[in-house]
Amino acid sequence: MEFSPPLQRATLIQRYKRFLADVITPDGRELTLHCPNTGAMTGCATRGDTVWYSTSDNTKRKYPHTWELTQSQSGAFICVNTLWANRLTKEAILNESISELSGYSSLKSEVKYGAERSRIDFMLQADSRPDCYIEVKSVTLAENEQGYFPDAVTERGQKHLRELMNVAAEGLRAVIFFAVLHSAITRFSPARHIDEKYAQLLSEAQQRGVEILAYKAEISAESMALKKSLPVTL
């Protein structure tokens, strides 16, 4: 996926009120960007980081500029717009870049399912195979090349794991897919030190037949694409 029109560069001053960030452009203008990320954004929003932002042509938007990427002071690219996790995953499935999810003839998004009234991110179907339910999570928390999810306690994420376990129990295919959107990450684990319950449920889900996949995106200021499978340690 290529960014079109091209992203613009600025330097981060601060992120605040979760959804806003102040930046300064190379020519000295100060802008307020929309921040499309409700998470803690640990390591993704340090003062002085380079920010890459898009600009909407919707004149009715109060904040027409959207923070898309961080380029950390160590040089790592991080996609902070959580909407891209699903977009990149869908693109990779359709391109058959994810070997474990290839060979299906139909892809549906936001399908209602489960006892807890959830919506699955993607459902894959083929005549000769069980339906495949895929829940996507965006991974941006990194420590010494180790990627972690979640970056804060997530009851919603815990619910999704319970739903996937029920799917697997019905004889269908259930997949939790971690889209790693941080260029410095080389391996993935659940963030037991942040949400122990989630880590426990992820291990239980694997034991009950839920598949765990982690794929890393190649990220630059020009483009992004999920390319590489990463090792997962529970």
Curated annotation (Swiss-Prot):
InterPro entries: SfsA, SfsA_C, SfsA_N. Keywords: DNA-binding. It holds the Pfam family SfsA. GO terms for molecular function: DNA binding. The keyword S-adenosyl-L-methionine does not apply. Residues 201-220 bind DNA. It comes from the Bacteria. Belongs to the SfsA family. NCBIfam families: sfsA. Binds to DNA non-specifically. Could be a regulatory factor involved in maltose metabolism. This is Sugar fermentation stimulation protein A. It comes from Shigella boydii serotype 18 (strain CDC 3083-94 / BS512).
